[in-house]
Amino acid sequence: QPISIGFQSRLASFESYIRNNENIFFPVIYQPFTEIKYMMGDKKEQHLEVLFSREFLPNLFITLNYDVDFSPGVYKRSKMQNSFFNGSLRYNTKNNRYGISGYYYNNKIDIQENGGIKYDSIFTNNTETDRSIIDVNLDDATNLIKVAGFSIDQYFNILSQNVNKSKDSTYKERKIDIGRINYHFAYQRNRYVYEDTDPLSYFY
């Protein structure tokens, strides 16, 4: 694909770590469900995920999901934490004539920036095996990315719905359905903050 030149609001290098409405789901379950996952890597990387869903009232389903990844990094100033939360709800009337669904999501990525190591020869010659003490170009720079949004969807069937599927001699199948009214509203806010307490550093 061709690469566009100029200002872009997209954060291409972080897109793989940012989740949005495509990652929201609306499970229909009739028993409370909870799932917890935890993993730790050999470099103290950690991953935690919690998923909870249940039917709170008849036909009212609520789901909550929290996901966080943490890495202390190998080099100086390379710590990273990526967290994601979303909640969704879904409700429809018993006759399915009216329904509403909605969701909220929030991404937060907090990254230390080091600008790379100062002297490439230390790496190429492997003169220092402890990467955590190798000098880097930036000592107090951070990247903060926040992406949050919510949405509401509603529908109303103009004609009542046939919810009785048992076809007896009194059942008459509707031949014409005049449709339904749909409403959709969505909002997303993007925030990207790069900060360095030493903006006059020779690195820039």
At which residue positions do the language-model features occur?
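Outer-membrane beta-barrel translocator/channel fold
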Residues: 7, 72-148
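Outer-membrane beta-barrel translocator/receptor signature
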Residues: 14-21, 26-85
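Extracytoplasmic loops and strand-loop junctions of Gram-negative outer membrane beta-barrel proteins
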Residues: 17-18, 33-35, 69-72, 130-140, ...
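Strand-connecting loop/turn motifs
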Residues: 31, 57-59, 93-97, 176-178
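Transmembrane beta-barrel strands of outer-membrane/channel proteins
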Residues: 36-40, 66-68, 102-106, 181-189
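Residues on the lipid-exposed face of transmembrane beta-strands in outer-membrane beta-barrel proteins
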Residues: 50-54, 87-91, 150-158
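Repeated loop/turn-to-beta-strand initiation elements of outer-membrane beta-barrel proteins
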Residues: 59-62, 95-100, 161-163
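Face-selective signature of the C-terminal outer-membrane beta-barrel domain
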Residues: 133-204
